[in-house]
Amino acid sequence: MEIACIHIGLMKTATTYMQGVWALDEKIALSNKGLNPVVEYLRESTAGNRFDAGKNLNIDLDQPLKAGQSLVLSNEGLSCGFLDSGDAEMLRIYQDNASIMMGTLASQTQNVLITFRSPVSWIHSMHAQFLNEGGSGSASEFLSERRAFLLQCLDLDYLLGLYRRYFRNVRILPYEALREGEDDFWASLGEIFNMPVPTVRDVPASNPSLSGQRLYVLSCLNGLGGHMRSVLQHSESYVGMEQERLVQVSSHYESWLNRRFVEHASEAELEQTLGWLRADTVPDDFRRFSISREFADELEKRYLSVVEEVTGDTKLVSRYRDELQQAITEPV
């Protein structure tokens, strides 16, 4: 089975939209959900220190392959995991393990795609994703607590080195090119990978993006639930099977309940919730953060200089650097 390309993310670089385009285009056969068992194995085996490089790689397609279709593998879980724990060293090992598993497909393709974006806007999106997955806290707290993890996510120098061990045609393309000139983006992708250019553009959103008051309420609810679980988990008066089961079940379902609530609650219901939480308004700095010079220097070494060297797009990288400089000067 010949593969047109393997798309590994980065996370929060319009991967869901791209997968939607590929899924709806008649010329493309997509494996996205079909890769979820692979991603789950990578996460569990990496965390448990039992990764087997010789494990058979079974990939399912999201829909049956039709004659003449080109196969695309796309899952951002191949480049990022452990957002909940923020374990940078575990992520580094995970990325290596993922590249080893994908490397077994080198006889079926030499094409790997990594999409990237401005680090400042990416951090904002990662903070929102962290809240969507059950986390809590401001953007500034998120950056402070997960600095090493975020740098590892953006370590393009490391990722490119991993995949170039197995694949000859590893390419990087910017998120901004897709957002600012979609037709040209798909045409460029078709040219560099010799694959069909999709014509689908009207892709329904799989999950609504949250912002402002809704995102803040989500953070508060997640934080409250986490506090309650922690108290019960360490309680000396409430012990036994019921306690263990309750903590486990609530951890699994609570983030979904909170997420769906803030998606579907009316404005009045959100205001009422804020009142119960004794938080009448969203703090002005909830979604703002500043970047240290040290953090910016690391991004320059691992990310910006790599993008500039590989793409030659000095104008785009200059834009990224300007945004970083602004984030050093004042909260963004």
Role assignments for model-derived ranges:
Residues M1-V332:
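Anion-recognition interface
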